[in-house]
């Protein structure tokens, strides 16, 4: 079952101080929230001096609240000419405010200050109140806020980050004991960089004992606004306390050069995310144009999954869906707009039992209306202005996207940092010193770089020489109906099949799902199958249709893994793992040897639009040693090495293989 979020209640004391009715405590001192944030957390962690001349600086906070600590830190960073290149701020919040309550609370706190504009930017970017990680970017991506909605006790151990500073904030230990427990401090210690600092308003004995036990050295300093003392200090364990160190930047990341092989939505998303961090990327595509294979379809549908148990696929599609929306809005704001629908998308149930499952999933998540709405049969009929057999889910921000236009926009955003090599086929990869060489069929070097990201779908397995990854091709044929043959719905609708209205009045319907069929020819039987599906889904949508052999269509191939999850991240050194199979029989993902600088972003199946941006951000974060945009469990669920790990654990691999 998902952890339903309970939003914070906006309430004030008579003196104007913001208070939490649930905890019976104030959010900040009556002497001023921003002044308190600057004294306790910014200065308490030796900032801004400690981030100066750094490429990246990461702060982890235990309670976001009104965001005043983030706003104060952002202002200090902006005012510092020697600031770090990228500031990461990771903050956990069990009871986030709604967007409008956050705007009111933060505006009240920063009234009559220069931070007011930042409040609007924060509120405008505020995500729907659903569990998980939400990555927001400000100041052209140089300030990155990762909000972690959920209980700190449960969420902190799932985070992957190397923290330079900790803001230990939250209601008093007597009011919220869980947030100050030893388990929380141990989770923070696992993320601490050497000599990472911390600061906290509290100086209670409970906090001091937990700090000491987790390996933090503390000292008392003057508190804020007459408070006698607060605590500051650093991570200084007396002995080694962790099996795995928090992640660092990849050793050769300083070169900031990469090859991306495959120019569909997966590869172009990687290009954009690396270029945004200052990487120079060579994009290699075997076709004349980018987005020529599955990404060349006229449109693709875009929506999350919802399940009652909120399983890995649901959480991953939710994270990908929301992150993609944030990235696409940033592209549009930067002048790189592309074609996408804006009236939501309806996922119709296929039966009464299917609708009951949708209702259970919706109720379990407690989804807010800006994320999903449950429509009964009458409501779905009214929304689509068409007869329907069952209700479904409305995703207000779901819809359809033209993948090729998105890929173009991502490459345009990368600007001069991307060099395109089209009509270029990579026959094999070869490691020479610290660089990978992409070679043609004659052994000539096409391009070289320390990092390669394989985003070329089914061919990635061959190029990487992976023996423990099996991808299956799935043929998908779509059909284009002329405007006279249908009355297009106001938004895309999906179920067992889909119907997407295009701008020219054409109706896109599809698609067939034919595993292990690699026939590229359009078939009349495929058109007939698509028509039958959509007629069941939306009776009355389709009228008279021309002869099937005259209909236009397109065939593309989706590549899927056995568990239907993508493969994203560093590729395993399978030869070394096999040679050490016995020692690695109980291995975790972090124990496995990896191919230096070789990453994958493939196997997206029919969910490339949902997963591509998130996958690209994960790879870029891994390369640069930044906080990951998803929890470790989700990253391990998409790790390309997961099948090898399972084989090792089952002792199905030996050095003789």
From Swiss-Prot:
Residues 1-236 are annotated as: tRNA (mnm(5)s(2)U34)-methyltransferase. The keyword Metal-binding does not apply. GO terms for molecular function: flavin adenine dinucleotide binding; oxidoreductase activity, acting on the CH-NH group of donors; tRNA (5-methylaminomethyl-2-thiouridylate)(34)-methyltransferase activity. Disulfide bonds: none annotated. GO terms for cellular component: cytoplasm. Gene3D superfamilies: D-Amino Acid Oxidase, subunit A, domain 2, FAD/NAD(P)-binding domain, Vaccinia Virus protein VP39. It catalyses: 5-aminomethyl-2-thiouridine(34) in tRNA + S-adenosyl-L-methionine = 5-methylaminomethyl-2-thiouridine(34) in tRNA + S-adenosyl-L-homocysteine + H(+). Its cofactor is FAD. It is found in: Cytoplasm. Residues 261-657 are annotated as: FAD-dependent cmnm(5)s(2)U34 oxidoreductase. Its EC number is 2.1.1.61, 1.5.-.-. One of its GO terms (biological process) is methylation. Keywords: Cytoplasm, FAD, Flavoprotein, Methyltransferase, Multifunctional enzyme, Oxidoreductase, S-adenosyl-L-methionine, Transferase, tRNA processing. The keyword Transport does not apply. It holds the Pfam family DAO. Catalyzes the last two steps in the biosynthesis of 5-methylaminomethyl-2-thiouridine (mnm(5)s(2)U) at the wobble position (U34) in tRNA. Catalyzes the FAD-dependent demodification of cmnm(5)s(2)U34 to nm(5)s(2)U34, followed by the transfer of a methyl group from S-adenosyl-L-methionine to nm(5)s(2)U34, to form mnm(5)s(2)U34. In the N-terminal section; belongs to the methyltransferase superfamily. tRNA (mnm(5)s(2)U34)-methyltransferase family. NCBIfam families: MnmC_Cterm, PRK01747.1-2, PRK01747.1-4, tRNA_MNMC2. This is tRNA 5-methylaminomethyl-2-thiouridine biosynthesis bifunctional protein MnmC. It comes from Burkholderia multivorans (strain ATCC 17616 / 249). The gene is mnmC.
């Amino acid at each position: 079952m998902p952890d339903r979020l309970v939003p914070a209640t906006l309430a004030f004391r008579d003196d104007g101080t913001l208070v939490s009715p649930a905890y019976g405590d104030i959010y900040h001192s009556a002497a001023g929230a921003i002044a308190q944030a600057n004294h306790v957390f910014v200065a308490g962690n030796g900032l801004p001096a400690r981030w100066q001349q750094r490429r990246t600086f990461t702060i982890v906070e235990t309670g976001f609240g009104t965001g005043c600590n983030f706003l104060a830190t952002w202002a200090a960073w902006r005012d510092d000419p020697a600031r770090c290149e990228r500031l990461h701020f990771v903050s956990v919040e069990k009871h986030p405010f709604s967007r409008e309550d956050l705007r009111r609370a933060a505006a009240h706190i920063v009234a009559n200050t220069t931070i007011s504009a930042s409040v609007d930017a924060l509120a405008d970017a505020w995500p729907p109140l659903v569990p998980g990680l939400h990555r927001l970017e400000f100041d052209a991506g140089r300030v990155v806020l990762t909000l972690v909605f959920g209980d700190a006790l449960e969420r902190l151990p799932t985070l992957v980050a190397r923290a330079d500073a900790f803001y230990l904030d939250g209601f008093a230990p007597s009011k919220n004991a869980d947030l100050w427990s030893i388990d929380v401090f141990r989770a923070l210690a696992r993320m601490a960089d050497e000599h990472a600092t911390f600061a906290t308003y509290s100086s209670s004995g409970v906090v001091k004992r937990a700090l000491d036990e987790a390996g933090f050295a503390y000292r008392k300093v003057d508190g804020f606004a007459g408070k006698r003392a607060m605590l500051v200090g650093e991570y200084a364990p007396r002995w080694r306390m962790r099996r795995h160190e928090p992640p660092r930047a990849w050793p050769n990341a300083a070169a900031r050069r990469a090859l991306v092989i495959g120019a569909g939505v997966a590869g172009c998303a990687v290009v954009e995310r690396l270029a945004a961090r200052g990487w120079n990327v060579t994009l290699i595509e075997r076709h004349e144009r980018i987005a020529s294979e599955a990404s060349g379809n006229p449109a693709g549908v875009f929506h999350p999954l919802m399940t009652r148990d909120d399983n890995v696929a649901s959480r991953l599609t939710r994270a990908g869906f929301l992150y993609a929306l944030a990235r696409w809005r940033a592209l549009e704001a930067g002048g790189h707009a592309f074609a996408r629908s804006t009236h939501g998308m309806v996922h119709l149930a296929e039966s009464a039992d299917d609708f009951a499952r949708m209702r259970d999933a919706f109720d379990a998540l407690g989804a807010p209306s800006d994320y999903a709405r449950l429509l009964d049969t009458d409501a779905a009929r009214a929304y689509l202005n068409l007869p329907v057999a069952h209700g479904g889910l409305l995703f207000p921000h779901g819809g359809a996207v033209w993948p090729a236009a998105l890929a173009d926009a991502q490459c345009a955003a990368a600007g001069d940092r991307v060099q395109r090599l089209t009509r270029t086929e990579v026959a094999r990869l070869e490691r020479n010193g610290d660089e990978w060489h992409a070679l043609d069929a004659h052994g000539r070097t096409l391009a070289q770089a320390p990092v390669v990201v394989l985003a070329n779908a089914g061919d990635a397995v061959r190029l990487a020489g992976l023996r423990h990854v099996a991808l299956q091709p799935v043929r998908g044929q779509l059909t284009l109906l002329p405007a006279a043959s249908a009355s297009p719905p106001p938004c895309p609708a999906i179920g067992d099949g889909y119907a997407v209205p295009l701008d020219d009045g054409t109706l896109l319907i599809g698609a067939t799902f034919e595993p292990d069929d690699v026939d590229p020819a359009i078939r009349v039987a495929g058109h007939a199958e698509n028509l039958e599906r959509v007629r069941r889904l939306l009776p009355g949508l389709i009228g008279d249709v021309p002869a099937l052999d005259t209909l236009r269509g397109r065939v593309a191939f989706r590549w899927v893994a056995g568990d239907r999850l993508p493969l994203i991240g560093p590729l395993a050194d399978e030869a070394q793992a096999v040679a050490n199979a016995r020692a690695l029989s109980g291995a975790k993902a972090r124990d496995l040897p990896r191919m230096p600088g070789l990453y994958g972003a493939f196997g997206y199946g029919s969910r490339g639009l949902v997963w591509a941006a998130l996958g690209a951000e994960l790879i870029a974060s891994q390369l640069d040693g930044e906080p990951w945009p998803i929890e470790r469990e989700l990253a391990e669920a998409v790790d390309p090495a997961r099948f090898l790990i399972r084989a090792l654990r089952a002792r199905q691999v030996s050095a003789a293989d």
